[in-house]
Amino acid sequence: MDWNFRNDQPIYSQLTQRLTEAIVSGIYAPGEKLPSVRELAVEAGVNPNTVQRALSELERDGLVFSQRTAGRFVTENENMIANAKLRIADERVGEFLHSMKTLGCTRDEVLSLIHI
């Protein structure tokens, strides 16, 4: 996973975003156990408290859940995962369209760039 962090956003927020992307893309499957806080902190090169905050955000959002001493797991609610995926896709499309508008691209120019 890419752990290069930008300076324009808190690291815990970027961790939350990357872990969400890993869940919706299937890197972490529904029901799969996530690496421990310490393992993620070492892998990402950040403080364990930062990872804990990111995982707490994911729990609050319902994408992961804790099982006392067993660790954290990805939700098995595939509708929740699908909704998170659509939310991310919608944000990215919005960013793309804003960039194209800033460049002065017309609707037809934008459509010609999209190859599905």
Where are these regions (language model features)?
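Glycine-centered, phosphate/nucleic-acid-interacting loop/turn motifs that mediate DNA/RNA or nucleotide
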Residues: G26, G62
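Conserved segment of winged-helix/HTH DNA-binding domains
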Residues: E78-L103
